[in-house]
Amino acid sequence: MAKRETKTDRRLAIAYVLVQAIILLLLIFTNISFGVSILKLAWPGIILEALGVIGVLLSAYSIRTSLTALPLPKEHGQLATSGLYRYVRHPMYTSVLVFALGLAVSSGEPYKYLLFIGLAILFAYKSKYEELYLAKKYAGYRQYANQTPKFIPLPRQKETIK
């Protein structure tokens, strides 16, 4: 394969990961109370957190040696279409979002809901960026993308990868 990405591409990929890490660290390690609590449900939040962690572990297991923190495929990586990848193209992102929603729900803090929304927006952009490289690297990716939902395992809506 020709050169995978430019330095600018790699810097943008690293920026996506850094912003993601900052949001997750704020969700996990901050506990700021503004005296307003919305939808604080400890046990449902904990259940969502656990489901998110399980999803991350299952997703990581499905891609094993192809796992990378950057939204750029590994040079010798393989296209994953089994396990949770059979149901959604980005189960790792979905699982992290479920975990993040759990953190927001269990705390009830409005800023954590805003961080969750920010993370969801970040993953929408990050996945679009990542899919450009996946489509270049794997011949079958476009077909897989057209048959498999991006984040939520619902009946397929028409979406075309360019």
Which role does the model predict for each range below?
Residues 86-94:
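Histidine-centered phosphotransfer motif of kinases
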Residues 1-81, 98-162:
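Membrane-anchoring alpha-helices and their flanking helix-loop junctions
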